[in-house]
């Protein structure tokens, strides 16, 4: 399935605790039987997310690379993506048949975006626990990502969030760009995200 342009590179961003690593895990497990998959994780001072994915058996350890960005995680996915590009080059060399590489950013805010040199497709993850107003606050993560994932929908009643309001605001802020609701802990919404990647990413 490898494209002539190399593997599809999917950037996964979002605030701390929104569910980025959970999404990466679920996507790896959902796609690894059909596609050759690898992951690059970004953490500020540790490789905790990479270790977590290996521990959860999302992929074998040779397919997961953790990079330590230091300081500001935005720089490693936007202004100077060289550390991530080096990790991707290493994966491509080690596993030449790769179809998909997920690049999980460090915890960031609504202003974070991926450099087009780094990611072909971007997914931005937010959580209903952050508040009903998050979609209408905008920011590049909300408005410019190829897919917005609104996670932890099961917790909406407990944090007094109206999912209909979030749905309406997300649609308004994103124009024609799609968004999905998910409960990643239970795997809800994962199939929709995989279908999006297959259609939008040309897999």
UniProtKB/Swiss-Prot annotation:
Gene: ureG
Residues spanning the signal sequence: none
UniProt xrefs under Gene3D superfamilies: P-loop containing nucleotide triphosphate hydrolases
Positions of transmembrane segments: none
Subcellular location: Cytoplasm
Annotated keywords: Chaperone, Cytoplasm, GTP-binding, Nickel insertion, Nucleotide-binding
UniProt: GTP binding residues: 14-21
UniProt GO BP: urea catabolic process
Designated name of the protein: Urease accessory protein UreG
Listed GO CC annotations: cytoplasm
Tree of life domain: Bacteria
Molecular function in Gene Ontology: GTP binding; GTPase activity; nickel cation binding
Presence of the UniProt keyword Chaperone in the record: yes
Keyword GTP-binding found: yes
